Amino acid sequence: MLAEAGYAYSSSVAPVAHDHYGWRDAPRYAFRPLKDSPLVELPVTVARVAGRHIATGGGFFRMLPGALTDFAVRQVNAEGHAGIFYFHPWEVDPDQPRVANAPLRSKVRHYSRLGAMAGKLRGLIARHDWGRVDAVVAREAALLA
C-alpha cells in the first residue's frame, strides 16, 4: 500500500521487544517487507549488547545514557550502514502540559528528562555524520539488489 502511494521507504520497524511496539526478530538493517515491492524498510537503529537489541531513539534516548546511542551509531556505521534515529517533537518541550491522572508508568515514559533532550540531541548531531534519508534509501536499496 505504501509503495502504491508513492513512498520509497518506511521506518516503522523497531527490532526490539517492547510492550507497546517492536518486532524482536526484525532485521537490524534495511530489508524489503514484500518480495516484489520496491519499498525499503529502514528499521530504527538499535544497540546490540550481549546478544540483545536495545532501543536507542525516542524515550530511550531521553532516559538512557547518550553513550548507548553513540555506541549504536558507531556500531551500525562500522557495519556499513547509516544510523536511523527518531524522536518525537514533543520530547523537546519540557513545558508541555501534564496529564494529571496518567498512570505512573506513562508519566515516567513521557515526562522523564524532557529538559535534557534538546542538549542531548545537539550533542548527538555534533558527534556523528548524518545525511539525507533519500541518499540512505538509495544506498540501502542498492545493497538489497
Each PLM stretch: what is its role?
Residues 63-145:
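C-terminal domain-boundary segment and adjacent tail
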Residues 1-86:
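Active-site-adjacent pocket scaffolds in enzyme catalytic domains
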